[in-house]
A protein has these predicted regions:
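Terminal amphipathic alpha-helical/low-complexity segments used for targeting or macromolecular assembly
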Residues: 1-49
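A detector of tandem-repeat and repeat-rich interaction/domain scaffolds
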Residues: 47-119
Length: 119
């Protein structure tokens, strides 16, 4: 069962890629059906399993994936081939990119950047 859908609302990121606002279809975690989330490029960026969610003005693009119970919010960005999973939280103006992985109970926030092959 799908937990979210892409809406027709979109923004265009600095590299010209269209990112679509997401909308919750069911209740899970702290998310209620009908809640609007952040922006993703494609459905594959956010898992339909677990409580993972992207909210506020957060952006997920490229081949990046958010799954498990991970949360990305605020103005955070996850892109490239990066993964955010487990109970990890990425928020504020933080960026995760490249082949980086943020997982477990890790928190990346403020203006922090995790990139390259970091994990």
């Amino acid at each position: 069962m799908k937990k979210f859908k892409l809406t027709s609302e979109f923004i265009v990121d600095i590299s010209g890629v269209k990112l679509f606002r997401i909308k919750a279809l069911i209740e899970f975690g702290n998310v209620k059906a009908g809640d609007l989330g952040g922006y993703i490029e494609k459905e594959e960026n956010l898992s339909h399993m677990g409580d993972a969610w992207v909210s506020d003005d957060a952006r997920i693009s490229g081949n990046a994936q958010v799954f498990g119970n991970a949360q990305v919010f605020g103005n955070a960005q996850v892109f490239g081939d990066a993964w955010v999973f487990g109970n990890a939280r990425v928020f504020g103006n933080a960026r995760v990119s490249g082949d980086a992985q943020v997982f477990g109970d890790a928190q990346v926030f403020g203006d922090a950047q995790v990139f390259g092959d970091a994990w």
